[in-house]
């Protein structure tokens, strides 16, 4: 990335490029963002673990949306039925930060829908015949939405998890595995809560990853995490993990996450998730 674009890196979302895309740049497209980004970033690779090559032009541009100063937090899905790729993202508009959806047939060029879908930091999943999303309700808590389709109206159902920042979702049978971090933790780390999707009952909460390595900020002082951009606030790496994203392939589960605050993207393989 150009120096002006690499001072903040966050919000990963990974897909395996579908077979119906001709001449892809690689087998995997990794979308990510800048907290004050003017476009959604993308890198590509032939292996999940990389190395990844930056697609310098980026994908969806701020100028192609109705947002004012930035777009970020991509959440990307393959809609096999329509042969399209859906990208949820958020940006600032009249009334605050909201989530929108854009569509692409190649994973690079996106057409935007100007109708807001809900609050920001959407992570969308499907259960039975409904679509759901977990989003951040300003800096208060999280909110669960329900919709009949990818780009339909998302109606709020209920709130959950005070101070949640960003989340990731994985569904197995009738269980939602919700990964998240929280503003105000010392240090900010990744948690997992299991939720029964038929009763919406939370079953278990556990901390699964905390900053330990140097590249995660593990050698830095413990501080209470704050809202907003870590690099804009501090101008340096901090001891925080944020922005989880879950990717599943060949019975293997991977978690991508923002490390040292918002100074890079890490990848970890998860074990024994959903076995008990």
Task: Identify the residue ranges that each predicted region occupies.
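Beta-rich carbohydrate-recognition and catalytic domains
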Residues: 1-73, 77-239, 248-276
